Amino acid sequence: YIIIFKINIIHARSRAPAWSCYFASLITRRIFVTTFHGTYNFKSNFKKFYNSIMLRAKLTIAGSNFIFDHINENYSEYLSREKKLRVIYRGINIDYFNPKNISALKKEKLKQEWDIISNQFTILLPGRLTYWKGQEKFIESLNILIEDYNITNFQAIILGSDQGRKVYTKKLVNLVQRYSLIKKVKFISHCKEMPLAYS
């Protein structure tokens, strides 16, 4: 397909496909580019080698300064002058996420579905339920708002699927119960319209 469709640049955004893309780029002599998104687990040397595919490109894009520093601190042996590492921040479609494009009717309907109280601040944490997305820290922060600062005029929504990680979901629910935040925190597993959720 690379030759048939006259593709000049092969861009991989995750590790498993990056390996096949890397070898395809060698065979077809095309430019190989990767985007390094997260702090991949590298407890073993094999895992670190597996992750290193993201740095075998002519250009590796780090999605943030944090990831840039993480790469330099943990994968320096895979960096060289020939292979460039650059920070390019992820963009958003500002028209798609413009709150002016969301009707008042849709907003009201979502408030009813999620049982949002109008006279309280709403704090939204979107993202799949996983340790490195920070839901535990989020819940702990809510407890600090109440215990240390006596701020109670809020409600929090943790929006995202656990993708089968039931043990982690149970851990979060237990944390909410431990801090007596049951009336403050709602878990919503899915939302088709993220611009609506943000609005």
Describe these PLM feature segments.
Residues 76, 98-115, 171-174:
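A short helix/loop element that forms part of the nucleotide-sugar donor recognition site in Leloir-type
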